[in-house]
Amino acid sequence: MSFSRSEAAPAAPLPDLAATLAAPRDDAFQQLGAAFVTRLPAAPLPAPYVVGFSDDAARMLGLEPALRDAPGFAELFCGNPTRDWPQASLPYASVYSGHQFGVWAGQLGDGRALTIGELAHDGRRYELQLKGAGRTPYSRMGDGRAVLRSSIREFLCSEAMHHLGIPTTRALAVIGSDQPVVREEIETSAVVTRVAQSFVRFGHFEHFFANDRPEQLRALADHVIERFYPACRDADDPYLALLAEATRRTAELVAQWQAVGFCHGVMNTDNMSILGLTIDYGPFGFIDAFDAKHVCNHSDTQGRYAYRMQPRIAHWNCFCLAQALLPLIGLHRDAPSEDARAERAVEDAHAVLGRFPEQFGPALERAMRAKLGLALEREGDAALANQLLEIMDASHADFTLTFRHLARVSKHDARGDAPVRDLFIDRDAFDRWANLYRARLSEEARDDASRAAAMNRVNPKYVLRNHLAETAIRRAKEKDFSEVERLAAVLRRPFDEQPEHDAYAALPPDWASTLEVSCSS
């Protein structure tokens, strides 16, 4: 969602914004009660300063971008004023549970994130959450802080994914501090202001199911349906309809990830959004040299969350959500006994989950057909796309550049093949595939120019490659935030040529292969 400056609401002065956030709130989630949230102020962050800011996210909230320069902005969005807020308006951390790397992990929760309030604009309400705001009752052994490195990565990827058209949480700002924190080495603290209509996760439902709290489970489901899935209210079984919609959104989200070569890295059930958003940017990565078995998370030694595994894991996670919702499914129908209701609930849930492949597969096929510039639907299109991925995998061809350069291929001859062909080690394999591709293009009415234009609207030239983020991070550690701003600006126009920024679209340098990202953020 976006709108022009002229359409935006007048900017609220910072004191008014702070007062709005500090006022007693009516946001529905925190009204669910003490079983769901714990209120506490953020831990003070000394001498905060602005590292990054999203004008676009600000406008989405009805705020003017000039807000970033207002005195006290950094203080407000690292949570420092919250210690002076009334108890009824304090930020809150929510509790949830979940499966981590396929194993039940029990109670988890917002271990370093606090929701400070809601803002309403253009008919929608958005929660504002500070990630890195200090310890909470759910921090376990953590210090409650986020580091500058991971905060910049989350900010940049939130911007990148939104402008790629992929559902995601947003990031309004990154606030830094010189406060040291210990990870694998000494780093500095930062806070990301995350924005979403809701941060409810699969793990919230799992928590109340696992702890046998049916009233809270039903209250949570009713909250999600009432606020985000109102069409489910009128279904024969609202809770089954909720499962169906969440499953569909998840299938379609992961299809979009696969289409741009995005790896999430930590697809635990507590990192799955009930709204089908990309959430919790940690050890993520966009694939450079294509490898279907690519694992972006250095901590994922078993490859559970590899690129090729993401659809299967998403489906598995939906099973976990279904299990948590089973006590609710069928409550609106008359059943001769609780056992009969429960048995029918399992059957109905399995039927919903069985549709996941039917939702994911066509969504990915549509995306791949568009990436190949195919306006017409033909039976062999999926096979053609899969054959391309296979030869890309064999040659470790660059994922993003392969699809971007395919727009130069002509339906008439091989004169435009060189840019993409040069990305392949096995060029004979590419030539064989290109001949099949040209034969398929001959069935299309569009000329090369119009097809190329359409392809360039779906195949990004610019993605957040790890080495680009690393360069911005290294400069930010020296208090030079210009590269964060510059890179964010490039990523906000991923499909545009931007010839002055061609270097951001180039193949990664050799040193990029040594970069590792892990869960230590």
UniProtKB/Swiss-Prot annotation:
Pfam families, A to Z: SelO (PF02696)
Keyword hit for Metal-binding: yes
Top-level division of the source organism's lineage: Bacteria
Residues the record lists as binding Mg(2+): 271, 280
Key words, A-Z: ATP-binding, Magnesium, Manganese, Metal-binding, Nucleotide-binding, Nucleotidyltransferase, Transferase
E.C. no: 2.7.7.-, 2.7.7.108
Active-site residue list: 270 (proton acceptor)
InterPro entries given in the database record: SelO
Residues the record lists as binding ATP: 109, 111-112, 131, 143-144, 194, 201, 280
Chemical reaction(s) catalysed: L-seryl-[protein] + ATP = 3-O-(5'-adenylyl)-L-seryl-[protein] + diphosphate; L-threonyl-[protein] + ATP = 3-O-(5'-adenylyl)-L-threonyl-[protein] + diphosphate; L-tyrosyl-[protein] + ATP = O-(5'-adenylyl)-L-tyrosyl-[protein] + diphosphate; L-histidyl-[protein] + UTP = N(tele)-(5'-uridylyl)-L-histidyl-[protein] + diphosphate
Cofactor(s) listed in the protein's UniProt record: Mg(2+); Mn(2+)
GO MF: AMPylase activity; ATP binding; magnesium ion binding
Function text: Nucleotidyltransferase involved in the post-translational modification of proteins. It can catalyze the addition of adenosine monophosphate (AMP) or uridine monophosphate (UMP) to a protein, resulting in modifications known as AMPylation and UMPylation.
Annotated HAMAP family: YdiU_SelO (MF_00692)
Family recorded in the similarity comment: Belongs to the SELO family.
Name this protein carries in UniProt: Protein nucleotidyltransferase YdiU
Organism this protein belongs to: Burkholderia pseudomallei (strain K96243)
